[in-house]
Each structure stands twice: as structure tokens, then as C-alpha cells.
Amino acid sequence: MIQHPRIGIRPTIDGRRQGVRESLEVQTMNMAKSVADLISSTLKYPDGEPVECVISPSTIGRVPEAAASHELFKKSNVCATITVTPCWCYGSETMDMSPDIPHAIWGFNGTERPGAVYLAAVLASHAQKGIPAFGIYGRDVQEANDTDIPEDVKEKLLRYARAALATGLMRDTAYLSMGSVSMGIGGSIVNPDFFQEYLGMRNESVDMTEFTRRMDRGIYDPEEFERAMVWVKEHIKEGVDRNREDLILSKEEKEKQWEFVIKMFMIGRDLMVGNPRLAELGFEEEAVGHHALVAGFQGQRQWTDHFPNGDFMETFLNTQFDWNGIRKPFVFATENDSLNGVSMLFNYLLTNTPQIFADVRTYWSPEAVERVTGYTLEGRAAAGFLHLINSGSCTLDGTGQATRDGKPVMKPFWELDESEVQAMLENTDFPPANREYFRGGGFSTRFLTKGDMPVTMVRLNLLKGVGPVLQIAEGYTLELPEDVHHTLDNRTDSGWPTTWFAPRLTGKGAFKSVYDVMNNWGANHGAITYGHIGADLITLASMLRIPVNMHNVPEEDIFRPKNWSLFGTEDLESADYRACQLLGPLHK
């Protein structure tokens, strides 16, 4: 059984015996325990289990104790460390020198002992040795016997832990390409060096004929297939067929297509993570899967010109339920856009929530909306908005039909209930695919995302000579008047899933206007997650050494390793590029 990645907690202490060290043992170890309790009681893994921490076997005052801690962490699948101390310690003697995992240090802000002095000293050693570390120092002085973690310290500890766990969860997993390059899209030109050096992941690939091989040879669970067919007939609403009359399939042909796309879902899932049932059926090799944390399906055009498209498969892999019940989502990219798949993966690992994959299709200015509909935009939509619409697939969680405190949300699977599942299904239909585009047919996913959800749109791009760069746009989904929505939606393909999105503007740079956001977006796709998580993404990007070229996160929320400030404090964007370029990828 594969262990969860863990956070290692390192209590460091003044090594002087005969009074000094002894007086600090309890306070120092209690700091470590309080950090471990905070993380384990607040954060969860994608499977819903509490995050696990490992505390060093003793306080760390000298090199042998640092080495013992390091050995324990190596055996315990520790993916990141947090060093805590209320006092002076010996900097380079007590630091963790592992170069390939993130590090953070919390120096207690108290006057009796110089925890802040150690923090500054050890961060200087980290900078000298080229091993980045995050510095955490509370804003307010605490009493020496105060065991509470201040709110500002909690925020940084949790932001660091979320991002660090994401690096550990990615490591030693795979991106699985089902097919190859789709329609010349750059993101589907999969770059194995990026995956290996920045994420610690490997790449695997199968030809799309693997789907037909498994169908023809019965390499799927026939009992599950029968159960799925019953469930689909009971719960899935087939939408209006908008095809030309000569392209409309017969009822019998559509029935066959439903059977086909259900098998596609089952095979796509089994390819990613395996299925023990296949071994029982005599297919031991196929039963193990590809250990894929994220995958993509090429589809267009070689597959979709002949076979039903992948929309149903993609939709339900990214959704948190199917005929087997509520479960965690998969991360699955349309058109094998690996870079948008990774963007979705970053979002997912930071939030444990399913992701919207969308084309960043259109900027609608207030003037254009008024000209076309006669409606004057107001509220969050007043400056215009973006039409986010994928070509036929999207997680059903993207409907916004789940709620928390009466408001629409996308939430982890362990919070989802059956009434919310039913609401998602009732507010979605599955029209036959547009056969002018998808000659082989299939079924698209059609819904409208509810408005007023805080969301973050993300995109990873590759820039020759630089490497990966990340873009982040926080904002809100919108709910337009029904007639306005229909007028605008019908100008595209109204059989596809739509999200209206207004990024939060700052009045400068790429966020001077909604038009500037669209104009500076680096690719045709974006990954959209529930919540404003831009600050967490910036922290994660710094751990992976990926510079952020565009974001609208308030400066006070930016949390990067301390040595980033040594690259400059006025122009943080340029300093980020220089730091990432000098340090290089995390796993190189």
C-alpha cells in the first residue's frame, strides 16, 4: 500500500546543556505538537483522510540529532519539513539540507528567547546553500508560556502545508496520454522533461486503439457495464438533437452510442488507476493501470471523425459521482492538453475539489452585450466578462448545484450528498454531439454554471528559453438574465457547458480591464477551480520554481521562500523570474 506523503516537524533547540537546553525542551516540543495538531485537524488528503505529520524523535540541538531526524523522515515518506523553535539554535548545524523538498521555519516571536534571531540566521544559511526555505514570524510578540499559534502564523503554516503536500502527491506518479497531439494544440505536445524535472512525474502513453481493443476483447467489467446502462437510462437526460436532419442518428444508433461512451468511461478510468476486477476476469496486466494522477484524451480528430467523442468519459471522470456512487474525481484533460491538465491538477491538490476545463472563448464588452441584447451590464459584470465553454465536456460539479450555507459551491466529495447529485443531474442534459465537428457522434454535456461563486482561473504555459510560467486570475462566476444568456450562448454552440466569468480587476497590468485579461491569457484553455486560491498557487509555484507572469493576488498575501527577497523587493514579478531561473526545477 502506498503511503500518504507526510509533513515532517522539526523542533530545534539551543544545544547548550546544564540548564539552557533543559529549560526549553517542553516548550520546543509543544510547539512541534501544536503545529502537527493544526495541520492534521485542518487539512485533508484527496481521499478525505486527515493529513499526517511526523515529529522528529527528539529536539534538534546538534548535527547528530538533525541526521537522526533526516533518517526518520526518509523512512516516513516526508515530502516537506517545518522547523519550529522558540529560541536561539545553531543555524547550519540544525537545518534540514534536503535539496529536493520544501522547507519552512517558524521562529517564535517572544522577547525572553531569540527565536527570531535563529530564524534570520538559519534562513541566511539556506540562502547561502541554495536550499530555499519559507520564513514564518508572527506579527505580535507572545508571552513565553503562550501555546497558541497566532492567526497570521496559522495562515502561513497552512498555506505552506497545502502547497508542500501538492508537491508530494505529484511525485512519482504519471501523466497518461491517451492518444497524441490534438489539432496542433501546443499543450498536447507533451514535454517529458517538464514533468520529470519540475513535478517529479513520469509520462506514459497509450494509443487510442487501446479503447477499441478493450471493447472488442471484453476487457472491462461486464457486470458494471450492465449496472451503468440501467443508471444512465434512469438518470441521464438526452438533450435536443440540433444536428442537420441528414446527420441525425436513429434511436437504435444512439442506443449503441450510449453503450460505446459508457465503455469509454470505464476503460479510461481503468487505464488511469487500474481495476482489480479485470484480474478476476483474466486480464492481470490491464488490471494494474498506469498509476496516473492526471490524464488526457486526444479525441480530435482521428478518433472523433470515426468514433463517438470523449465528452461523456471526460465529464464523468472529472465529476465526483457515477453509477457506483459518490467518489473523489479524476483529473482529466480534453484534447490531451497536458498543460491544462497540470493546471487542473495544481488546483485539485490545493482544494480537493473537481475542476472545470474550458476554452477561454470570448471577451464580451459591455458595449457588445448591449448592442447584441439591449441589456446594460451591472454589478460584477459591469466591466464585461469572459465566456468559458468547453467543446462538449465538463465536470457536473461545475453546475454549482452543490451548496454550503445556502450558496453555490464546488466542494470535496466527502461533503457531497445525494440531493446535490440529483440537482446536478437535473440541471444538465446530454445532447447528441454536433456531427459537423464530431463526425463519429457521441453526447455533449450541457449546463449553465450558477453565478456568484468565487473562482480562480489558472493556466500553465511553456516558454522556450524560460520553461513553465503560470497565470492566475481570481474572480466570480456570473448569472446573467435568462434571455441575455440564451442570446449570447446561442451564438456559440448551445449544446456545450457554459460558465460566465468576471475576473477581479486591479487597475494595472494585465488586470486593467477584462479585455486585458483575455488579451494576456497564454493559451486557448484554462482550468477553473472553486475559491480564491491564487495565493496558494503562488506558494506552490515557488516550491516548483515556476515563475508567475500574471496574477491579481494582493501583495500582502504572497508567500514565497525568504531568499526570493534577496532577488529584489520592489518588483516581485522580476524577482520571481530570477529566483526560479537561478535555482532551477525542484527535481532536476
From Swiss-Prot:
GO molecular function, one term: arabinose isomerase activity
Entry's Gene Ontology BP terms: D-arabinose catabolic process; L-fucose catabolic process
Cofactor: Mn(2+)
InterPro entries listed in its UniProt record: Fuc/Ara_isomerase_C, Fuc_iso_dom3_sf, Fuc_isomerase_C, Fucose_iso_dom1_sf, Fucose_iso_N1, Fucose_isomerase, Fucose_isomerase_dom2_sf, Fucose_isomerase_N/cen_sf
Keywords (A to Z) from UniProt: Carbohydrate metabolism, Cytoplasm, Fucose metabolism, Isomerase, Manganese, Metal-binding
Pfam families found in the cross-reference section: Fucose_iso_C, Fucose_iso_N1, Fucose_iso_N2
One cellular component term from this protein's GO annotations in UniProt: cytoplasm
SUPFAM superfamilies: FucI/AraA C-terminal domain-like (SSF50443), FucI/AraA N-terminal and middle domains (SSF53743)
Major subcellular site: cytoplasm
Enzyme class, first EC level, given as a word: isomerase
Domain of life of the native organism: Bacteria
Catalytic residues identified in the record: 335 (proton acceptor), 359 (proton acceptor)
Amino acids binding Mn(2+): 335, 359, 525
Localisation: Cytoplasm
This enzyme's EC code(s): 5.3.1.25
Keyword Manganese among UniProt keywords: yes
Catalytic activity: L-fucose = L-fuculose
UniProt pathway annotation: Carbohydrate degradation; L-fucose degradation; L-lactaldehyde and glycerone phosphate from L-fucose: step 1/3
Family to which the UniProt record says this protein belongs: Belongs to the L-fucose isomerase family.
Function: Converts the aldose L-fucose into the corresponding ketose L-fuculose.
Record HAMAP family: Fucose_iso (MF_01254)
Protein name: L-fucose isomerase
Provenance organism: Streptococcus pneumoniae (strain JJA)
